[in-house]
């Protein structure tokens, strides 16, 4: 390790010990390496023993900087790995850091765009509108249309910091996995690898631009969701330009009520937007925390969500959607055996799983949920309970489902903040049932035929020729099979003859040996010669 890496590693260990994060493992589970580290750095004591462990972890990550803050935010969504008293405080981590110099941001943009900003923009504000760990945002106007826009630029010094911290994270995860077998359940190496992919994706603003364009296209002319327009001509790996929007932050309940917003409809539309993305588009915004969601102040009686920051999105294939919809419907019908069978059929748990035991485990965990009214049941926690139970039966981590669960928890939490009486099941059930009708049954068959009709219309003129070629190939194949069969029969006959001759030869040789003992030397010699002759014939038969 370089001196810089050693210095950073010491800083990380120092913060961990000063916040008592070795308490994450009980004393009897501490491996030799962590115990030795704690004793050798005896001057580093827990400075916050009065605080709960979850709060100490949050404060430590906050002190370590932006890369670790975002890591903590990701861990807060992994409720399959961490209990609520750890995950809940991590959800409070704020990705806010001091802005860097506006002149430096401008220079960075000009380098990325290949010319002075004044060529394309006017009224560029050197004071950032917002600043986060990865990027910061400035406002300006397009010269050609006078449209207000925001320019998002990646921090110029962030990549080396991220690379260095990720390298240390990988090493620490590897050490933890090897030194502490009890910690392997938390899958430290896989968690860091997942975080690394997410973080590096966020460093490429072309991905975010493409995601925003796709999401905007999916909700063109929608009353439910508005996605600001992205200007691809001014967007690249380190800069993204998009339309500036004005709205009320979705967490500003007081502001929304003061504006006369229909809170019930707004909450229901949040659920509608989520399930539309998942089941209609198979493409969903996976970072719907309150900082990325605003409400259009116009037409408060018919409220519209505004989605920002499309850096993280999730996708589901048809099989995932089908099993997800069927799981929800089976769960709310309390058909736990069907839930268990679906997990096996989908390949989420091994095929040799005992269905009866799995069904019983699901029933124990999920049945108490129905003690509550349906309007109080959390979809997100339903998924969480199902996945946690399935993990005991060796369910592999499904990244797309982890993103879905995280997003569902966000949407559900926002919806119930806006309108506590929100009945998520009543709002979501029509989406699930309609999607199932479109996937199974006569309607699904008709839709499939419609979808494939252009392809078959294109191939229809070629059908007679293809049929003729297939028949010719079939005839040639039959002839070839006949030849192979005749050859096989001849070979078997030769082998049978060879075995017979070999057996006769062996018998004669044995007789020759017996005759030698009885002083019939001439007869013995003749018998031996005959036996060898039969062996030669058998060898020749095998060679053919």
UniProtKB/Swiss-Prot annotation:
It comes from the Bacteria. One of its GO terms (cellular component) is plasma membrane. Its EC number is 2.7.-.-. It is found in: Cell inner membrane. Residues 123-501 form the Protein kinase domain. Keywords: ATP-binding, Cell inner membrane, Cell membrane, Kinase, Membrane, Nucleotide-binding, Transferase, Transmembrane, Transmembrane helix, Ubiquinone biosynthesis. It holds the Pfam family ABC1. Pathway: Cofactor biosynthesis; ubiquinone biosynthesis [regulation]. The chain crosses the membrane at residues 496-516, 519-539. InterPro entries: ABC1_dom, Kinase-like_dom_sf, UbiB, UbiB_bact, UbiB_kinase. The active site is at residue 287. ATP binds at residues 129-137, 152. HAMAP family: UbiB. Belongs to the ABC1 family. UbiB subfamily. Is probably a protein kinase regulator of UbiI activity which is involved in aerobic coenzyme Q (ubiquinone) biosynthesis. NCBIfam families: PRK04750.1 (NF003404), UbiB (TIGR01982). This is Probable protein kinase UbiB. It comes from Vibrio vulnificus (strain YJ016).
């Amino acid at each position: 390790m370089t001196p810089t890496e050693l210095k950073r590693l010491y800083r990380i260990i120092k913060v961990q010990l000063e916040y008592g994060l070795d308490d994450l493992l009980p004393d009897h589970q501490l491996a030799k390496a962590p115990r030795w580290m704690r004793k050798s750095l005896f001057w580093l004591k827990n400075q916050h023993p009065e605080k709960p462990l979850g709060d100490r972890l949050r404060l430590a990550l906050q002190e370590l900087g932006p890369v670790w803050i975002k890591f903590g935010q990701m861990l807060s969504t992994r409720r399959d790995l961490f209990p609520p008293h750890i995950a809940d405080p991590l959800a409070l981590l704020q990705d806010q850091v001091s802005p860097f110099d506006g002149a430096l941001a401008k220079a960075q943009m000009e380098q990325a765009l290949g010319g002075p900003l004044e060529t394309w923009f006017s009224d560029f504000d050197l004071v950032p509108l917002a600043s986060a760990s990865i990027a910061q945002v400035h406002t300006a106007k397009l010269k050609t249309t006078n449209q207000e826009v925001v320019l998002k630029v990646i921090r110029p010094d962030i990549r080396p910091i991220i690379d260095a911290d990720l390298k240390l994270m990988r090493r620490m995860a590897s050490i933890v996995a090897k030194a502490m077998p009890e910690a392997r359940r938390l899958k430290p190496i896989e968690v860091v690898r997942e975080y690394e992919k997410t973080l590096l994706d966020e460093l490429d603003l072309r991905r975010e631009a493409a995601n925003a364009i796709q999401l905007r296209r999916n909700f063109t002319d929608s009353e439910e969701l508005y996605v600001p327009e992205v200007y691809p001509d001014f967007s690249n790996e380190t800069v993204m330009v998009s339309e500036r929007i004005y709205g009320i932050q979705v967490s500003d309940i007081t502001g929304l009520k003061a504006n006369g917003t229909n809170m019930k409809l707004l909450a229901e539309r949040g659920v509608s937007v989520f399930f539309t993305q998942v089941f209609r588009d198979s493409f969903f915004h996976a970072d719907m925390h309150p900082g990325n969601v605003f409400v259009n102040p116009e037409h408060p009686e018919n409220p519209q969500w505004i989605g920002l920051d499309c850096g993280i999105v999730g996708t589901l294939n048809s099989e995932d959607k089908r099993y997800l919809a069927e799981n929800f419907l089976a769960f709310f019908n309390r058909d736990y055996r069907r839930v268990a069978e679906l997990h096996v059929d989908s390949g989420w748990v091994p095929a040799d799983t005992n269905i009866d035991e799995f069904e019983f485990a699901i029933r124990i965990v999920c049945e108490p949920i129905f003690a509550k009214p349906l309007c109080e049941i959390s979809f997100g926690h339903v998924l969480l309970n199902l996945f946690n139970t399935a993990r005991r039966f060796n369910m592999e981590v499904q990244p797309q489902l982890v993103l879905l669960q995280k997003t569902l928890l966000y949407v559900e939490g926002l919806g119930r903040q806006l309108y506590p009486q929100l009945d998520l099941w009543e709002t979501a059930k029509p989406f699930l049932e309609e999607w199932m009708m479109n996937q199974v049954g006569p309607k699904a068959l008709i839709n499939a035929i419609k979808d494939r009709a252009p392809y078959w219309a294109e191939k229809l003129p070629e059908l007679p020729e293809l049929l003729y070629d297939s028949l010719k190939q079939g005839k040639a194949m039959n002839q070839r099979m006949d030849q192979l069969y005749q050859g096989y029969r001849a070979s078997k006959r030769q082998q049978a003859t060879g075995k017979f001759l070999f057996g006769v030869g062996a018998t004669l040789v044995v007789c020759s040996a017996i005759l030698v003992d009885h002083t019939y030397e001439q007869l013995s010699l003749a018998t031996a010669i005959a036996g060898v002759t039969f062996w030669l014939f058998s060898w020749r038969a095998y060679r053919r």
